[in-house]
């Protein structure tokens, strides 16, 4: 018998009986700000303003205005849960994904009869078609520009179909058949394809796939140079599952869709057409972004003309709170893999592990664990930090620690800054570098002298490693190891 294909429902079946990882509620919730407001207290975490915490994924079964739709949020809002869903140690997920990138399993196309994503089909030509009534996209806060698709995997291809790619973008529902999509300039392959179509003044066919195996979602967030132009990140998910991701031909567009997605929106990125992101609200805000602040509404988003909405029977709408721990998992773990790949190529064996903690939203900060064999390795840790900035341009802060420090425990990491760090010796500041435009401190008015354009930044390296010739003076207190210590709690 063939193995059951991986999809969101198979993953949920594996975790649904664990109350630490999954909870359902039948209490009615309004998708307009209330749903995200509720989950903020239960399990959002990340850079969300306190009070918040790490908690279970939540399935909301009674969504106001959408009687036939369930909404899932927080599925990846725990690194331990991601490890459980990937059947792998959460502490070495970066290494695991690095191996997956190097050994991709290409997706395969199946017949429509084998694609549950096409169980139910609505076309834009149908009477009364309105994506705002078909797709239960939540609004994160009352200030949002509108309902957002926050974890939709966009599938697109080059004009000659020789290359295809998947990426995740924020997309706001603007009208009955219109989405605004933010494609950050530079680095995104979907953006390169869209530019190609726009120069030819042709609409670009795409599909937006929602409600997926988290292996697909997390794999889709890899960026260059780890996944170069022409690398389809669905191969990463295939490697994680040792099973090809299944695709199906679109119903109304000449493009592939993910065959086991809960929802698929088909349509076209329209050439030379733009829309004001907050055209329906005029709040000046988009939605909460990973640094923990509301993003500014973009005055000129690219436009997606929707031609169809398809979904599974009893479909699950999946959503992510922008600054939550879920984003940390989605962006941070692939970034760890990217850093490990580049650093190990240049200085093999010297960086034992990497962690992008919630404080940086998965993008802005990394903690690197360093191994020194002898005095010739002194200084190699700072070269590793510089390589990390090369691997991921949006990285802002690197903290270097020794192997006796738990990089997943921020108290242990901060301890190194208090006992293994002198600011006048162990601090590196790198000015005038490129970073992420969503960091509000990277605006010219913050520092007109050094920040000429938005998205420029000074980067920081904190070297909390012990000088090799002083290792014996920094040995931590060694307590007795007691194998059966847990019996004292019974």
From Swiss-Prot:
Prenylated FMN binds at residues 168-170, 187. Belongs to the UbiD family. This is Gallate decarboxylase. Its cofactor is prenylated FMN; Mn(2+). It catalyses: 3,4,5-trihydroxybenzoate + H(+) = 1,2,3-trihydroxybenzene + CO2; 3,4-dihydroxybenzoate + H(+) = catechol + CO2. Disruption phenotype: Cells lacking this gene are unable to decarboxylate gallic acid and protocatechuic acid. Gallate decarboxylase does not form a complex composed of Lpdc, LpdB and LpdD. The term subunit has been used in reference to the three-gene operon. Gallate decarboxylase LpdC is the only protein required to yield the gallate decarboxylase activity.
